[in-house]
Amino acid sequence: MKIYHGIFSECGPRRKNEDYIAVREMPEQVRSVFVLCDGMGGHHLGEVASKLVAEHICDYWTKNPKRKDSEKKIIDACNETMVAYNNKSRVEMGTTMAMAAIEGNKALLAHCGDSRIYVIRNHEIIYQSTDHVALTPEGWPIITRAFFTGSNSYTPDIKEIEVEVGDMIFICSDGVYGNGKWSALKDTLEGKDVYSYLLSSVEKIASEKAHDNYSAILIRICRDEPADKTDTYLFKLNRRLRGTDDEFEPIEYFRFRREAMDRLVELNCYSREKGTYQYGVTRYVDGNGAKWIKNEQQINDSDE
């Protein structure tokens, strides 16, 4: 299986962004880990807490490459995070955490707080994490599980699933689903939009009436090998383009549309430097090479 992912993290109406996303991809171990943290309002240095937790958990994965992914591995990573930073700082801070650790066809999903994880299969949400939230006597919601909040209630809920080709895992902070647009968000996640459009559609929904930072990771599980020679050509073309323009990171699992002998492939790319999405179209006639059009420049490719 091959994993594609895309992210966004925006400040919204707040003065600073306390959300943080960290990703580690380890193709030699057929393993990836994705962590999203949301620094808690009302605590000092929420942006510091979210970065510390996300980076430390990801670093734990890269420092322990031979250790199989497991519930205990997640708990050990969380415990090490707490020990490392509690020993360094007494400053009040807090953060939620939601993560996906994928190894082969197994995904471990873990969260504490109100950052959420969704699993979408065949255009249907088949799993949604449960928020760790309670109401005060006055009716205000409070987070009951988080890092660095002066209690030991940071142990995450952990769910193990077997992933299938076509599955998507969506991880987000509460700023994404908490703006009153849940119905539109759910329809989009379960809809039939091609994957390249999906992340930008979700980001647009999250930005409407945003009251908080909003961040998300969208992960797509794809097949390792293309199904036919035409698909093989497109995979090779994608690798060539990625190698010649490493500023752009493709996050799309290809969508094909046949028009007589022609094929049209639409590919979304995320520019790390510019923080924006770029849109490119590759069009080719079977057996006659390809043309890649991006940013009003056309590059001919006649490989195979």
What are these regions (language model features)?
Residues 1-237, 241, 245, 257, ...:
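PP2C/PPM-type serine/threonine phosphatase catalytic domain
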Residues 125-127, 250, 298:
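Residue-level detector of beta-propeller blades
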Residues 20, 249-252:
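Short, polar loop/linker segments at the starts of domains and inter-domain junctions
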Residues 242-246, 254-280:
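A short, charged, amphipathic alpha-helix used as a generic interaction element across diverse proteins
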Residues 266-304:
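Short, mixed-charge low-complexity intrinsically disordered segments
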